[in-house]
Each structure stands twice: as structure tokens, then as C-alpha cells.
Amino acid sequence: MKKELLESCAAMYRTPAYIFDTDCFRQTIRNLRDSFGKDVGLCYAMKANPFLADRAENEADRIEICSMGEFQICREKRIEPKKMLISGVMKSPEDLAEILGYCGEDSLYTVESMRQADYLESWSRQREKKIRILLRLSSGNQFGMDEDTLIHLLQKIQNHPYLKIQGIHYFSGTQKQIAKTVGELRKLDDLLKRLEKEYGIQLEELEFGPGLAVAYFDRQKDCIREEIRELSRAIGELRWKGKVTLEMGRAMAASCGTYLTTVKDTKQNGGRNYCIVDGGIHQIHYDGQIRGMYP
């Protein structure tokens, strides 16, 4: 954004303030679509910046909603349920009942555990409504299910009349090195091919969070363009031929925001220069968790 515009915003809204260039946000998503091609889906992980969820609705194929606060934001913004991917993380039966009551068959849901699968199975059977689900594969932490549990669940419900398994969801973290991302993608390719060969299970979609690293500071090397090319090449080399949807937050949102703060005082202590500003460190930390829990 131009300096004159930022100065005008600072005068109008006062500081500290976040200023978001929504045209830049939209263009970033369009650039990503051009880079990966029309066959690769794009999902906006709104935890990166919940303020941009409604802007993402018309550009991304879907919006990943993690917390109940994020769901409430989308509901208030009247974002269509068909654009929502509902994460199973930290969802109680009461939470799921509220979400299902609003979204029903229109949304896509990720399943984090056998317990969640049982709840969705019961809900869909009682109402005779079909629900599309993604089974989340754990990366070795507390999220998702390990491979044995996931395969067991696939076998258990692959022919269920109301639960349709659309594919697998995988996300292991953010700000990763591209070598790790490509390695994870190849392991997922091996698993998807093994499911076809050994179990006769053909899945339609892989929802994959690449966790591309974003340069936030002036001295950081910005490698995202090279990493996008490498990731696109790796997707093209997959032996499994289903649809890949890339779930991204920072890679879409980081470049469109500017944080404004005003220097209120300057001084020198012990030979070191200091600026006292009206902003706080809490305002440049990861905002998604706070905004998502308390909309």
C-alpha cells in the first residue's frame, strides 16, 4: 500500500491499527490459482486472518473453519455453508449439533477421531441426510488419527448410506521448509496408492496443508515463489490421480496486511536506542487463535 494511504488511515482510525488491502488479497489467491492450475483446489484457512473470510468466499474454493468462533464469524457474514470446510478439532457434540443444524448436508466436515465419526454417523442416520467427510491423518501429534485407525475407519464406513468419505485431510504445521512439505506429499501419495492396491479404496480428494513459509520481515529471504513452483511440480508427479486441494492461510493473507503504530517517545539507554510506541507485542503475534475464540 502507498505511504500516503497508510498515513491517511493512521490519521482517520488512529494507531495502533491493522490495515488490509483486500484487492491484494484477492490477487494473491488468483496468482496462486494461476501457479497451480485449474485442477488444484484452493482452501483459505481463515485462522490466518478471520477478517478476510468474506473476501475469500468468492476467490477460494472453500474456507477452512477451525474454532467455533470462526464458525460464528462465517455465520454472521452469511458465508454459504457449501463454501465451508468444518474442522473437527475441539468440537463437542453440542458444537457439532449447532454446526450441523446450520450447515447440514451442504458443508464438508473433517473427522478427527472415531468418536466424532460415531456422532456424525448417528446424526446423519437419524435424519437420513448424507454428509461428506474428510478423514484427518495425524502427522504424529495429537491431531487427527494414526494410519491404522484411519484405515480401520475407511473400511468400516466406506459403503455407509449416509456418510460419504470424500478423502483425506493432512496438515502438519506452518512456516515449513519446502523439502519437508514435498516429502509429506510423497508419503501421502504412497498411502493413497496403497489404499487402492491393498484395500480397493479409491478416494476422490486430498486436502493438503503445505504450510508454505512466508517472509514477514525485511531481512528474511522470500522464497515463496520458488517453493510454489516446487510444490506444483511435486503435485504433478503424484501417481495417485485424485483431486488435490491446497489449504493455505498465511500464503494467501500475509502480503495484504500492514500494521501501523506511532512512535511516542525516543531515548537511549546504555548506548542503545529505543522507540516507545503505542502498539504492543500482543498485536503482532498470531491473531487467529484469539480472534477465532472471541469473535
Walk through the language-model features, giving the residues of each.
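Generic N-terminal amphipathic, Lys/Arg-enriched alpha-helix
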Residues: E4-P16
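Charged (often Lys/Glu-rich) extended helix/loop segments that serve as interaction or gating elements
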Residues: L5, E230, K243-P295
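A glycine-/small-polar-enriched, mobile loop at the entrance of the PLP active site in fold-type I
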Residues: Y13-T22, L42-C43
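Active-site-proximal beta-alpha core segment in soluble small-molecule metabolic enzymes
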Residues: D39-E205, E230, A234, K267
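Glycine-rich beta-alpha junction loops
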Residues: L137-S139, S172-K176, P210-V214, R250-M252, ...
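Short glycine/threonine-rich loop-to-helix capping motif typified by GTGT followed
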Residues: I178-E184, A215-E227, A254-D265
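Acidic, glycine-rich loop-and-beta core segments that form the ion-binding/anion-interacting portion
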Residues: K187-M248
